[in-house]
C-alpha cells in the first residue's frame, strides 16, 4: 500500500515539476483525481485552489475531464475555508446533506465556468446531489479540495501527503516564474541601454535614419 501511495505521489510530483505555465494545473488536477482514485479512494473530483488578493483561482478535474480555469469569490463557504486555513488548520472536513447540499450546488451554479457544468449536471441527474463531503487540505499558497460521496477517514493522511508534495513543486514553479521574469527584465534593460547609448553617441539628426 505504501509503495502504491509513493508511486501516486511521484506521478503528481513529476507532472507539477514539469509545469511551465499555471494553466497546466488543469491537467495536474485531472492527474491528481486519477491517482487518488487509483488508490481506491472514490472521489467525485479534485481541485487546486490558489489564493489571490480578494478571490481564489481554481482548477478542477474529475473522471469526466477538466474544466477551464475559473475564479471563486471570497464569500460563503469559500471565505470559511480561507479563514480556517489562515487560522492554522491543516485539514477541514465539510459535509453537505439534504437541502444544504442542494443549496450549495445552487450557489456554485451561479459561478462562471463551473456553474455551466453544474447546470448540465442538474438536468442529466434530475436534480443536484443531496450529499457530499469536501476534504480541504491546506498548503502555503491555498488548498487542495477532494470531493467524495462517502466518508473516507482512511484517506485523510493520503490527502495531506498530496498537499505537501504539491506545495514543494508549486514553490519551485513560482521560483521558475520569478527567475524568468527577472531574465526578461534584464533583456529589456539591455535593449533600452543599447538604444540609449546609440542616441547619446549621435552627432547629427541624419543618424536617426
Spans of features found by a protein language model:
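A cross-kingdom feature marking solvent-exposed beta-strand/loop segments within repeated
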Residues: 30-34, 128-132, 145-146, 150-157
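Helix-to-coil/beta transition segments that act as allosteric "coupling" elements at the rims
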Residues: 104-143, 151
Amino acid at each position: 500500500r505504501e509503495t502504491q501511495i509513493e508511486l501516486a505521489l511521484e506521478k503528481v510530483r513529476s507532472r507539477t515539476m514539469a509545469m511551465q505555465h499555471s494553466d497546466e494545473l488543469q491537467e495536474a488536477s485531472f492527474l491528481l483525481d486519477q491517482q487518488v482514485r487509483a488508490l481506491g479512494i472514490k472521489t467525485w473530483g479534485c481541485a487546486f485552489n490558489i489564493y489571490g488578493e480578494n478571490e481564489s483561482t481554481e482548477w478542477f478535474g474529475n473522471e469526466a475531464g477538466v474544466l477551464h480555469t475559473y475564479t471563486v469569490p471570497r464569500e460563503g463557504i469559500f471565505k470559511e475555508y480561507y479563514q480556517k486555513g489562515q487560522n492554522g488548520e491543516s485539514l477541514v472536513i465539510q459535509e453537505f446533506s439534504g437541502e444544504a447540499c442542494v443549496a450549495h450546488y445552487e450557489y456554485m451554479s451561479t459561478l462562471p465556468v463551473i456553474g455551466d457544468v453544474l447546470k448540465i449536471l442538474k438536468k442529466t441527474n434530475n436534480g443536484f446531489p443531496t450529499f457530499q463531503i469536501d476534504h480541504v487540505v491546506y498548503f502555503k499558497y491555498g488548498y487542495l479540495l477532494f470531493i467524495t460521496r462517502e466518508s473516507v477517514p482512511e484517506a485523510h493522511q493520503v490527502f495531506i501527503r498530496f498537499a505537501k508534495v504539491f506545495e514543494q513543486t508549486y514553490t519551485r514553479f513560482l521560483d521558475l516564474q520569478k527567475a524568468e521574469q527577472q531574465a526578461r527584465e534584464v533583456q529589456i534593460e539591455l535593449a533600452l541601454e543599447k538604444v540609449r547609448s546609440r542616441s547619446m553617441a549621435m552627432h547629427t539628426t541624419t543618424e536617426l535614419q
